[in-house]
């Protein structure tokens, strides 16, 4: 059993004793903690909290515990049940609620679940709020309601449709062009909530030909749910058979979007955001943001339009903070996460699909041809395992000193920008390791510079 408590929420494997896994005792504790925090921080007069969940097998159990606890804390619960992460985020603002809890472990296997915590803006808690959650949980500073002040319960299953309504209302979503293009689309929804909302989205976008793979929301994931090439053999083979113009693949909570070209070749998750940004910038010039570990291609595309690109620390809340500070019109993360402020400040695969199909319809190209129009970069992802007694921060400081003549960014680990490549070093918050991401114009060059930096780290660790 595993239970991980962090500033972004609580996640773990289902079962075990108190503090060992994600079980009812720990769910009650952290729901109570969140309810206590939101009571202090919410500026609204609302007494509502929204609860949504992906299709995990444990979801119904976890939801029932969360809902009962919130009512016991005096909160009025709006249960939107099976819903994507972006749907739940939008529901918070549409309801005028004080916050929301999303029950999803994102791309983790079916034995995992988690509580992801939202503020009154439908955005994830910041670091200070996350730390306060951990403090309240440790101190067990809870105050439950008396019998006359218990919260109420309301189920509302309209938010999937409301989410789609909001996507279709976006100025840059060109439904007429998509209908005219008569696309054939394949989808893999890994037997979670994407299987509910993606077919409805595509139908309302005017896509008449949809090949559905793993669209039953049973929570029995048909493959590893992270939308990476090594896990997507079935839909890649379907595409090689010439059955569709493009394939969309989402993770269990539908905040990440991967795509597959008409020839069965992966589009590249780093290029989901790059492509959508190209379309957005063409029509609404402005700044862009992605995290330090994302492809340089977004910077290149942004500069093509004479706009400014900025990098944030890794993590959605950090990307959103930087986007607000720089008035970015589009941003996100290189794992297929598209954040479009005209919709809301959260990664949203539905927005990504609608904008991508609009762009594809306007360009009149095959998906593989569109992909070829963007700068070719390759990212290598590695790690250096260290012993617990080694001072990781000291090693990162020494690496920074060694490469002081290069462009350095140290807002999140150390990123070294060379003229034609980069390397990003980040320490793990939970393990004695350093993650090493490197990018260059060929995979060989990316691996080479990554290995060079890893050799430096290993040499420093021996001293």
Q: What are these model-derived regions, one by one?
A:
Residues 131-165, 169, 261-334, 338-339:
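Proline/glycine-rich low-complexity loops and linkers
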Residues 36, 48-112, 200-260:
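N-terminal small/polar loop signature for handling phosphorylated ligands or for N-terminal nucleophile
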Residues 244, 284-463:
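Phosphate-binding and adjacent anionic-ligand microenvironments
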Residues 13, 113-240:
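Gly/Ser/Thr-enriched, mixed-charge loops and adjacent short helices
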Residues 117-120, 258-262, 339-341:
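Short beta-strand-to-turn element immediately C-terminal to the catalytic PLP-Schiff-base lysine
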Residues 51-54, 187-189, 261, 342, ...:
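Short glycine-centered, acidic/aromatic-flanked micro-motifs in structured strand/loop junctions
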């Amino acid at each position: 059993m595993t239970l991980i408590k962090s500033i972004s929420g609580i996640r773990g494997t289902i079962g075990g004793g108190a503090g060992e896994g994600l079980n009812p005792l720990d769910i009650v504790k952290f729901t109570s903690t969140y309810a206590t925090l939101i009571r202090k921080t919410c500026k609204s007069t609302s007494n509502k909290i929204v609860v949504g969940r992906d299709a995990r097998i444990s979801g119904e159990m976890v939801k029932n515990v969360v809902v009962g606890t919130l009512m016991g804390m005096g909160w009025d619960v709006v249960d939107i049940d099976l819903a994507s992460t972006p749907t739940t985020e939008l529901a918070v603002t549409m309801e005028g609620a004080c916050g929301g809890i999303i029950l999803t472990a994102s791309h983790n296997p079916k034995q995992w679940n988690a509580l992801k915590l939202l503020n009154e803006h439908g955005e994830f808690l910041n670091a200070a709020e996350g730390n306060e959650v951990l403090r309240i949980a440790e101190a067990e500073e809870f105050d439950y309601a008396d019998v006359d002040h218990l919260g109420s319960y309301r189920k509302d299953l309209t938010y999937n449709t409301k989410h789609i309504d909001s996507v279709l209302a976006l100025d840059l979503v060109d439904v007429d062009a998509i209908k005219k293009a008569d696309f054939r689309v394949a989808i893999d929804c890994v037997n979670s909530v994407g299987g509910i909302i993606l077919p409805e989205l595509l139908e309302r976008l005017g896509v008449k030909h949809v090949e559905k793979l793993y669209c039953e929301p049973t929570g029995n994931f048909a493959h590893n749910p992270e939308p990476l090439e090594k896990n997507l053999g079935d839909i890649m083979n379907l595409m090689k058979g010439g059955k569709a113009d493009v394939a969309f693949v989402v993770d269990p909570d539908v905040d990440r979007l991967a795509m597959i070209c008409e020839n069965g070749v992966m589009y590249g998750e780093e290029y989901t955001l790059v492509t959508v940004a190209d379309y957005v910038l063409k029509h609404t010039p402005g700044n862009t943001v992605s995290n330090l570990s994302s492809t340089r291609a977004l910077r290149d595309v942004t500069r093509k339009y004479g706009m400014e690109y900025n990098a944030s620390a890794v993590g959605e809340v950090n990307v959103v903070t930087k986007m607000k500070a720089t008035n970015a019109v589009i941003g996100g993360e290189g794992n297929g996460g598209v954040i479009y402020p005209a919709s809301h400040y959260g990664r949203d695969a539905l927005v990504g699909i609608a904008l991508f199909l609009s762009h594809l319809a306007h360009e009149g190209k095959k998906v593989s041809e569109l992909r070829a129009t963007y700068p070719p970069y390759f990212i290598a992802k590695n790690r250096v395992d260290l012993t617990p007694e080694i001072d990781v921060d000291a090693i990162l400081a020494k690496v920074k000193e060694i490469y002081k003549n290069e462009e350095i960014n140290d807002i999140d680990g150390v990123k070294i920008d060379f003229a034609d490549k980069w390397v990003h070093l980040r320490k793990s918050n939970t393990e004695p390791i350093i993650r090493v991401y490197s990018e260059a114009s060929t995979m060989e060059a990316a691996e080479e510079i990554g290995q060079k930096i890893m050799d430096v780290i290993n040499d420093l660790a021996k001293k």
